[in-house]
């Protein structure tokens, strides 16, 4: 009987771990977030209400977020009739419904849900504006990180992390990039 050398076994195990993997789904506390239009989002239940749910953390003062507003508006428009729900969440200590409602209306953004105390942000590991989490229809985290690879400029060659994850999930595939770097302003949660 021939025994495989230890180096071969280690290599085989390491290769089995290669490739994209979906991020671990965090334990999300039961919360009801009220948005600027008077609607509510109950987590974690509502995260599995659509084919794909995209949660984007928002900060009114963040120039990185402002730069990405056009891409967010396009994301909402392009996927609205395909079962994709986009939820903007403001976890900042200074967040008010009135200020966020005004900002959403002026900037053409969807209603913004308030996350007092940053409980949802903490549960999802969101420390920066533009941090995005994409959930599948079972409410599992399938992507987490930045909207794309841009920080403060909209480059045509930016890696479209969120759009690619949404397209992959709608096509029944694993997201090709399950994690990306979040580039934005630090959330002032407390």
Name each region found by the language model.
Residues 46-66, 166:
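Short active-site neighborhood of thiol/selenol oxidoreductases, capturing the structured segment around
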Residues 59-70, 93, 183-188:
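Short, thiol/selenol-centered motifs that function as redox-active sites or metal-ligating centers
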Residues 66-107, 113-123:
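Structural microenvironment flanking redox-active thiols in thiol-disulfide oxidoreductases
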Residues 116-190:
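Thiol/selenol-based redox catalytic cores and closely related redox-interacting motifs
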């Amino acid at each position: 009987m021939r025994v495989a050398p230890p180096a071969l076994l280690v290599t085989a195990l390491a290769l089995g771990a290669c490739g994209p993997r979906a991020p671990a789904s965090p334990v999300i506390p039961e919360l009801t977030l009220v948005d600027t239009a008077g609607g509510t989002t109950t987590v974690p239940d509502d995260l599995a209400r659509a084919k794909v749910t995209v949660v984007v953390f928002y900060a009114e003062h963040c120039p990185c977020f402002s730069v990405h507003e056009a891409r967010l508006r396009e994301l909402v428009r392009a996927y609205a009739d395909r079962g994709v729900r986009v939820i903007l969440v403001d976890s900042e200590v200074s967040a008010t419904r009135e200020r966020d409602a005004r900002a959403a209306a002026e900037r053409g953004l969807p209603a913004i849900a308030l996350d007092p105390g940053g409980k949802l942000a903490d549960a999802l590991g969101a420390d920066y504006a533009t941090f995005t989490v994409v959930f599948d229809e079972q409410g599992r985290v399938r992507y987490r990180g930045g909207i794309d690879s841009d920080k403060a400029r909209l480059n045509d060659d930016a890696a479209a992390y969120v759009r690619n994850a949404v397209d992959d999930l709608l096509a029944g595939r694993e997201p090709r990039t399950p994690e990306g770097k979040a580039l934005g302003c630090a959330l002032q949660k407390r």
